[in-house]
Amino acid sequence: MDDSADDDHEDDSADEAAVRATNRAFYDAFEARDLDAMSDVWEHSDRSSCTHPGWGTLHGWGAVSASWFALFDGPSPLQFILTDEAVEVQGDAAWVTVDENLISAEGGGTVAAVNLFVRAEDGWRLVAHHGSAVAPQS
């Protein structure tokens, strides 16, 4: 019997779990407004990019990190309830699609997000985040 297929499946499961954990760490850092934890999740490079709802795309870790500093200095913290999360791992890249259901003192809403991760020597790092507001259902 060939155990290589089982080994590949175990590797895939471990990678998927690691990507899910890194994705969760991103949202935990966001909720806590923790710049150090947010920095730990991201790849610090020129290829990092971030598109917050209503913003243009930011390129490079400097611009991305500055955006988190500005957002964390905002009026009220956010709580995320994540739904419809799907994870795909292909080699050294992975992506998560997820609906971010937001709760804040100002109200809430839903953002459809895509988070792109790359494998680094010490784990998975977020290299791109894109969030688009979802129109409220009537």
Where are these regions (language model features)?
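A beta-strand edge to alpha-helix "cap/lid" segment located at domain peripheries
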Residues: 2-37, 48-138
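Helix-to-beta-strand junctions that scaffold the AdoMet/dcAdoMet cofactor pocket
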Residues: 43
